[in-house]
C-alpha cells in the first residue's frame, strides 16, 4: 500500500481544487470561523468536546504571526459567546517559532492569557522533531510562570518520548499523547507499527503514573482498548482523562466511546488556507492520503484503522 499512498500524493497537485475540497470536507470544518462554530455545535450536541485549530500558511513575517494571534482571540470570543465546549490547539510555527523564540513566546503568552481571561485552555501542538526541544522548553517556561491553562503534545513514535515524560513529571503535565505523523529518520522515531504501539502504551503508563492529565489521541482501536484498560486499572474518574480523535475519522469508534461514558474531544481545523494545509499534511505522511482515499470511496483496506 505504500506505493499506492505515494502515487496518490503525487497526483494531488493535478487534482482540481474543488475535488480536493470535497475529499477534505469531512476532515476540515471549512474556511471560516462560523464553519468551525457549527461543527463544534454538532459535536457538542452528540456529547463530544472539541479543540479548534486555526489553519494558516507557513509564517514568513511578524505580521502574519500577529494575524494568527488575533484569529485565536476571535475563536475564544466566539466560544464564550456561543457557550461552546471547546478549547484550542496552536502550532508554534504559526506563532512565529521559525522567526525567533522570543517572538513566539510573546505570541503564545498573549494567546494563553486571553484564554485564561475566558476560562479556556490552549494545547500546544507538537510538530516535527526539529521543534521538539523548543516546544517542551516553552511549555515548561509557561507552566513555571504560573500558566496552568496550557498543555502540550507528545508523540509516541519518537524514541525520546518516555525520557521527556520523566523530565516533565514535576509539572504533572497536561498532555495529548498521539502516535505522530511526521516523517522522521529511524534514529529519531520508531518506524515499525508494533514498536510505535508498544511505545504508546509505555508512554501512557508513564504519564498516568506521574499524575498527568492525558488526552489519549488515537484511532487505533487496539490502543483505545489499552487506554480503557489502563485508566480502569488505576480507577480514574472520567474527569481525569479523555480520548481525542480527528474530525470525520472513525466516527463509529467515537460513538462507542461516548456511549460508554468516556469523554471524547474532536480536533476541528478551519481556515481559508485549507488547501495548502491539506496538501502539506498529506505530503508529510502519504499513508493519510491512502486512508482518506479509501475512506472516501468506502473501501476497507487492512491496517488503515491503525493510524
What kind of region is each of these model predictions?
Residues 1-307:
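Positively charged, amphipathic and often flexible ligand-engagement surfaces
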Amino acid at each position: 500500500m505504500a506505493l499506492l499512498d505515494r502515487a496518490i500524493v503525487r497526483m494531488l497537485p493535478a487534482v482540481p481544487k474543488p475535488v480536493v475540497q470535497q475529499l477534505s470536507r469531512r476532515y476540515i470544518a471549512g474556511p471560516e470561523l462560523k464553519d468551525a462554530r457549527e461543527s463544534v455545535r454538532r459535536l457538542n450536541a452528540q456529547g463530544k468536546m472539541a479543540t479548534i485549530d486555526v489553519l494558516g500558511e507557513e509564517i514568513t513575517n511578524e505580521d502574519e504571526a500577529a494575524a494568527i494571534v488575533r484569529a485565536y482571540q476571535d475563536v475564544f470570543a466566539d466560544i464564550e459567546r456561543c457557550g461552546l465546549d471547546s478549547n484550542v490547539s496552536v502550532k508554534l510555527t504559526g506563532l512565529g517559532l521559525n522567526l525567533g523564540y522570543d517572538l513566539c513566546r510573546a505570541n503564545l503568552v498573549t494567546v494563553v492569557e486571553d484564554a485564561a481571561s475566558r476560562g479556556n485552555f490552549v494545547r500546544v501542538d507538537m510538530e516535527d522533531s526539529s521543534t521538539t526541544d523548543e516546544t517542551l522548553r516553552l511549555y515548561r517556561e509557561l507552566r513555571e510562570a504560573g500558566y496552568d491553562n496550557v498543555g502540550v503534545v507528545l508523540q509516541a513514535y519518537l524514541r525520546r518520548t518516555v525520557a521527556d515524560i520523566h523530565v516533565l513529571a514535576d509539572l504533572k503535565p497536561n498532555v495529548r499523547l498521539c502516535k505522530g505523523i511526521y516523517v522522521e529518520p529511524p534514529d529519531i522515531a520508531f518506524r515499525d507499527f508494533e514498536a510505535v504501539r508498544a511505545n504508546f502504551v509505555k508512554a501512557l503508563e508513564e504519564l498516568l503514573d506521574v499524575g498527568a492529565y492525558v488526552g489519549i489521541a488515537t484511532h487505533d482501536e487496539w490502543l483505545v482498548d489499552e487506554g480503557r484498560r489502563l485508566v480502569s486499572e488505576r480507577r480514574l474518574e472520567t474527569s481525569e482523562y479523555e480520548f481525542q480523535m480527528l474530525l470525520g475519522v472513525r466516527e463509529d469508534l467515537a460513538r462507542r466511546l461516548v456511549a460508554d461514558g468516556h469523554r471524547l474531544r474532536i480536533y476541528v481545523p478551519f481556515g481559508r488556507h485549507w488547501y495548502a494545509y491539506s496538501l502539506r499534511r498529506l505530503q508529510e505522511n502519504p499513508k493519510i492520503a491512502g486512508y482518506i482515499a479509501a475512506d472516501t470511496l468506502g473501501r476497507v483496506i487492512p491496517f488503515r484503522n491503525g493510524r
